Amino acid sequence: MTIRLNKVTRDLNVGIATVVEFLQKKGYTVEANPNTKISEEQYAVLVKEFSTDKNLRLESERFIQERQNKERNKASVSIEGFEKQQEKPKSEDVIKTVVPEDARPKFKPVGKIDLDKFSGRRTDKVEKAPEKKVEPVVEQPVVEQPVAEKTVVEKPVVESEVKKEEPKVEKVEVIAPKPAPVEQPVVAPKPAVETKPVEVEKVVVEEVKKEEPKVVETAPVKAEERKVERTAEVTATVTTPTEENASKENEVFKIRQPELGAKINVIGQIDLAALNQSTRPKKKSKEEKRREREEKEKVRQDQKKLMKEAIIKEIRKEDSKQAKPGVKDNNADAARKKRNRINKEKVDVNNVATSNFAAPRPNTQTGKGGGNHPRPQGQGQGQGNNNNNNKKNNNKDRFKKPVIKQEVSEEDVAKQVKETLARLTTKGKNKTSKYRKEKREMASNRMQELEDQEMAESKVLKLTEFVTANELATMMDVSVNQVIATCMSIGMMVSINQRLDAETINLVAEEFGFKTEYVSAEVAQAIVEEEDAPEDLQPRAPIVTVMGHVDHGKTSLLDYIRKANVIAGEAGGITQHIGAYNVQLEDGRRITFLDTPGHEAFTAMRARGAKVTDIAIIIVAADDNVMPQTKEAINHAMAAGVPIVFAINKVDKPTANPDKIKEELAAMNYLVEEWGGKYQSQDISAKKGMGVEDLMEKVLLEAEMLDLKANPNRNATGSIIESSLDKGRGYVATVLVSNGTLKVGDIVLAGTSYGRVKAMFNERNQRVKEAGPAEPALILGLNGAPAAGDTFHVVESDQEAREITNKREQLAREQGLRTQKILTLDELGRRIALGNFQELNIIVKGDVDGSVEALSDSLIKLSTEQIQVNVIHKGVGAISESDVSLAAASDAIIVGFQVRPSGAAAKMAEQEGVDIRKYSVIYDAIEEVKAAMEGMLAPELKEQITATIEIREVFNITKVGLVAGAVVKTGKVKRSDKARLIRDGIVIFTGNINALKRFKDDVKEVGTNFECGISLVNCNDMKVGDMIETFEEIEVKQTL
């Protein structure tokens, strides 16, 4: 039989190195490995050498076990414990160190006990010398009560070790009611124990048996019970070493043998039957102990309460005495008392207010260390005189604390502080000090006013009318989404770059707790609006805006009405510009149509169209549903207070279902006239012209109801529909005249641009001399591209126009500075936390202002938490050299929408490495920028498990390390994979595969159910049964 070295070291309580060294000395070669196996012969040699270490370990374990049992079972021991103590030493293991320690203190004589008290019959035997030896044994437990606990602990231990003793224990427990059986359990162990003291014990117990029947009724004192029990315990513990004399340490125990014998004789002379065990108090349960604790706590609380009431009464008495001073105290004594009282108050206040300062307290001593350290009385340096009062006075001092708390109020503190300050400032009361004080007060007041003013101004927004939603959000330091949500809650659909009017700005700002102040008021007042006399007003043509979802047939309808093909000229077959057309019907009446884009990017254009229009035609395709842009167009029209006419298009298609559209409109609370509502609707086919004339009739009917009038004989005012930069003609603006007549040669002021009208064209590009109310026109001669949606006015002189535009430019610059987003510390922290934060700077150039606005709006919307899109510049016209240099300086890309770079700009871009992207369709521009943003995102690493391998055998190969012989359970393991070692479901190691072999050949991969040899880089902990999981890391492209 072989035994592992690990087990041997545990059994013999020695280290592996010690065992290996010893065996080598004896001529055995053994590896210093815990799993090394040794023969029985080697084991016998080790046992012979290290048996003492083994015994020591067993002893210590036994001692620890006894101590733990002692703590668990704290019960008193009667004779049963005494008997068990005798029998317990049967175990061969001798407690060498512990027994002498227990025995020594127990023989120290402390006092004497008169044993004659127990019974008269035993006096004959007890009168001899043994009495003296009993005294120390009996008295000692009284001093060291834990002895009783020790004996109790040994009771369960003996039960577990010696099974034969269990019946004896049961009989011994019945000692009090039936004492007769006590003799049997004591007699039984006698043959097993050879020592003489045990025989003496037997005699003693026999005597007890004889005496018991006569003295059962007597009830001696409890103290005597305890003494007798404890003597029994002591003798039991002392006899233990006598039974273990077979061990090597006989010498130690021989000295004590005669003493032990004498003590045993003495115990035999005590009448144990006279002790009534039933009088011993029972061990209290946890519940009883808890009740006792609660009762004590209750008593303590009651005492505390009574003490508190007494203190309060005392305080009140003192207060009443102070409040009613005697009549006799009008002399100097009364004054002195009063002064003392005030001083006392001051001291109390200071104690409360400055309790943390270095004022000396009673029983504290200040030293080099600084601070007050409480010291016990009489233990200061030198231990000098203690100037402490007697206990009575100390109690008084202790009771004064609540007095302070009750007397001191905030008013008293304030009064005290005031008096102190007044006392401090009275020094040197001359004119200069008064003057300085007044000056300081004035300065502090001024500072306070400035602070208040700044606080008030921080909540006031200084802005020009028509700031965009994005700029407003920046000024209020809130998210633009919140501003848009607020606008939607009041029934307005706005986009990020849509300019808001004054009324909307006021509402939104008030919602966020800001006040508005329009700094352009003086500029607005510079242009005086003329009131028209009713007799000057003449009927004008209605302005009708066609709105709806993309591809629902808006432009097709206008093409039919105008007998033109606009769609063919639009890139991608979708409208990307707002168009204004004046159409004359067969009966001679005129209608001005505005065609708006349906794509979601053109929200601002639709809003602008709804703002300047009189009537809105909402087109819905009969073979489709009411789409999001349709709903948005309806909301824009409703917000502008414009009458709506629904045109249900494409009714000629086989899949058309006009009733379904009417049902969806009814669900949105727009009930058509056919269904008993107030909104007119017409089924049409824009391609074939079905129902178009009826639609015109209904539109003109709405116009008649509105009674539209204007004064053509005055200076023109109106709106900028679109503006662009034409290569041959310069800046061109499409305008819609709302009042007056615009003529060639008029000085037009629009936003920050102005100029003399050099030429005018209608929508068919035919030159015209003038444009009346509700007529669109294309004007040339402006010095810049005005923003779409701006109003234009005709002014008298060029100088007036220049002054107003200069002021507006200044305001625009100020507004730009105010709305410029500064990188805050919070934003910087957010970017650092993200780790891979990116910024994409874009310069947008387009052919018309509306398209530039729509495109930049859509690009800003693409911003995410990880990538922020910044449109650092946007403008109308071709891509110039200045755009390229700006892009090179700010690492931006240039997006051109239906514009091309000039030759010089293209060459410069090539040199500087600036990326210029040119688009004709807004969809393409948005999609490509989105793809570029996704490319900026760092790819995600994902793990894909390729195989699981089970280790069947582990080989330790020199210079290679551990190699596992394994079987591929699932999948296919590749040489390039990474691997993790798993043991009992826990990952032990993760790393790369060092080698993958099959029959001594290196292989690239091993399939399922094939065996292979595998080793991992720097892995030296493999065991049979471990699992190896192989995986590969795949880069996954992130999406927005």
Swiss-Prot record:
Matching PROSITE patterns: G_TR_2 (PS51722), IF2 (PS01176)
Coiled coil: none
Residues annotated for GTP binding in this entry: 548-555, 595-599, 649-652
GO terms for MF: GTP binding; GTPase activity; translation initiation factor activity
Subcellular localization, as worded in the UniProt entry: Cytoplasm
GO terms (BP aspect): translational initiation
Main location: cytoplasm
Amino acid composition bias (Polar residues), ranges on this chain: 351-366
Classification via HAMAP family: IF_2_B
Function as written in the Swiss-Prot or TrEMBL entry: One of the essential components for the initiation of protein synthesis. Protects formylmethionyl-tRNA from spontaneous hydrolysis and promotes its binding to the 30S ribosomal subunits. Also involved in the hydrolysis of GTP during the formation of the 70S ribosomal complex.
Name of this chain's protein: Translation initiation factor IF-2
Designated gene of the protein: infB
